């Protein structure tokens, strides 16, 4: 009877972990995108208020006419762009625009790029921290930091405070993403369950990206700047409170085993291949988001609604792929194959961007990019947890910090190289280069088909176990240690050796 109640409690715990990680990723990525339609107009208005005088008749209560002539492409193009890149786009594409808009574009680029930069710096510290203190304390801290960031966004009226809010969000986002992925890998030991759980959690990520910009624009237009951020702050309070109430009794745990050092994981070729797949597919998205809007304006005089709708299939197809491919890749133990197919599809699709000329082509191609990226992420993320199970100590914070660093590198490097390359060789050549890189890298995923096992002795409950092809499941709820054999990637593990 006790064992049945224990299993029920463990199943309930898994569902609660999944709900909390879903909320965490949804919140972080909705805050990532909700500022996109708000910041340009708000910064322009504040700059105009600062430079206007009472006698010049400037009306600072409404958006100046010039702000309405700036399409969403400037926002999208500056999402991860460098300041010099945004300045070039401003001068070449909108020569008739007000000169102050160039300054606004630089500020927007700095603001939106600061999160990925801070997250890139913080991730190597968050990963080992979660391995040392567990996942729940960083998760709780992440919710608290996001509450602080949303509050700063709501009440900030200067560029410096907005930059501080965006940087704080990077710290909170790092805590949420690293600890969230680690929690899922820790409680979902079965391959199929883990893949399905991570696919559902990625749905929260995609929904946040889809809902963020429309929600922000509507709330900003009809309620004001503070409203969307206060709503997100309330969601953060609810998510953090739910997490605290559920997992507070679990703080009294048995001694936590020491995770594998960061440098050791970075020397693992399989983990590097998996992280590279995530990085290069992210590089595709970051580069396209930066350069496609301006290319559409130059070649087809795209309108505002066209520049906004062209990226919608990206997130929608990412949402679909993350649920479908995560289940298929784990059900048939073919994560490496789906990752290889996803990268190859992303490469071919990226090259096709340079040969397209209508909005319908771009919509279809963005749908393929979203599906390809979702396929790679939903296949590789669970795989990184398996690699730690197979080759290292099964503590997951550091390995998912590496995965998050790979995402941040893609979003930081993509826009930086996009501007100079487009200026020198053009948009079609840039797409061909990025696509070819993905096509060349895709075959490396084949090496993930049968990674070698790496036995590592660990002391648990006073007994030394040599991990070869065996999972040892640590359940913090019951403080019990279950040992079972789980075949992965078509391999049958030999019996465990007890010392």
Language-model features, listed with the residues they occupy:
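Juxtamembrane intracellular "pre-TM" segments in multi-pass secondary transporters
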Residues: 2-12, 249-275, 462-479, 483-488
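Extracytoplasmic gate region of multi-pass secondary transporters
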Residues: 35-37, 271-312
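Conserved MFS/SLC helix-loop-helix module at the cytosolic interface between two early adjacent transmembrane helices
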Residues: 121-156
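Helix-to-loop junctions at the C-terminal end of transmembrane segments
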Residues: 122-134, 321-334, 422
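Helix-breaking motifs and short loop linkers at transmembrane-helix boundaries and internal kinks
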Residues: 134, 155-160, 189, 301, ...
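C-terminal ends and interior cores of transmembrane alpha-helices
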Residues: 144-157, 344-357
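Cytoplasmic helix-loop-helix junction between adjacent transmembrane helices
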Residues: 165-204
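Helix-loop-helix hairpin linking two adjacent transmembrane segments in secondary transporters
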Residues: 201-247
């Amino acid at each position: 009877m006790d064992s049945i109640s224990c299993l029920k409690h463990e199943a309930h715990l898994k569902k609660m972990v999944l709900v909390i990680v879903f909320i965490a990723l949804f919140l972080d990525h909705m805050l990532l995108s909700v500022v996109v339609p708000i910041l340009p107009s708000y910064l322009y208005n504040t700059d105009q208020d600062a430079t206007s005088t009472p006698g010049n008749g400037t009306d600072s209560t409404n958006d100046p006419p010039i702000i309405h002539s700036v399409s969403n492409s400037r926002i999208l193009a500056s999402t991860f762009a460098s300041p010099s890149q945004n300045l070039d786009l401003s001068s070449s594409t909108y020569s008739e625009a007000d000169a102050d808009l160039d300054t606004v574009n630089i500020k927007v680029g700095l603001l939106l790029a600061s999160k990925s930069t801070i997250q890139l710096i913080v991730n190597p510290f968050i990963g080992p921290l979660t391995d040392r203190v567990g996942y729940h304390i960083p998760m709780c801290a992440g919710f608290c930091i996001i509450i602080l960031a949303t509050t700063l966004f709501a009440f900030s009226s200067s560029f410096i405070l907005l930059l501080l809010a965006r940087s704080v969000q990077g710290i909170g986002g790092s805590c949420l993403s690293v600890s969230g992925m680690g929690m899922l890998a820790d409680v979902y030991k079965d391959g199929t369950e883990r893949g399905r759980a991570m696919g559902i959690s990625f749905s929260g990520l995609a929904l946040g990206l889809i809902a963020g910009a429309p929600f922000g624009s509507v709330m900003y237009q009809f309620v004001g700047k503070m409203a969307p951020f206060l709503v997100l702050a309330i969601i953060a309070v609810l998510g953090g409170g739910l997490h605290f109430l559920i997992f507070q009794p679990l703080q009294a745990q048995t001694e936590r085993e020491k995770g594998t050092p960061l440098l050791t994981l970075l020397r693992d070729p399989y983990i590097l291949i998996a992280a590279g797949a995530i990085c290069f597919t992210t590089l595709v998205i970051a580069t396209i988001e930066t350069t496609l809007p301006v290319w559409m304006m130059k070649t087809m005089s795209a309108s505002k609604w066209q520049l906004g709708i062209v990226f919608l299939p990206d997130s929608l197809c990412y949402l679909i792929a993350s649920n479908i491919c995560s289940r298929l890749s784990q059900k048939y133990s073919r994560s490496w194959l789906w990752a290889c197919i996803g990268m190859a599809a992303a490469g071919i699709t990226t090259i096709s961007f340079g040969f397209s000329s209508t909005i319908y082509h771009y919509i279809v191609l963005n749908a393929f990019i979203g599906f390809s990226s979702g396929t790679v992420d939903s296949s590789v993320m669970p795989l990184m947890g398996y690699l730690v199970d197979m080759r290292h100590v099964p503590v997951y914070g550091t390995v998912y910090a590496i995965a998050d660093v790979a995402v941040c590198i893609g979003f930081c490097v993509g826009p930086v190289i996009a501007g100079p390359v487009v200026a020198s060789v053009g948009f079609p050549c840039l797409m061909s280069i990025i696509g070819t890189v993905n096509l060349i890298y895709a075959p490396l995923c084949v090496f993930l088909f049968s990674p070698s096992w790496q036995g590592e002795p660990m002391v648990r409950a006073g007994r030394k176990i040599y991990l070869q092809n065996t999972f040892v499941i640590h359940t913090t709820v019951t403080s019990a240690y279950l040992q079972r054999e789980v075949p992965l990637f078509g391999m049958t593990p030999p019996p465990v050796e007890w010392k």
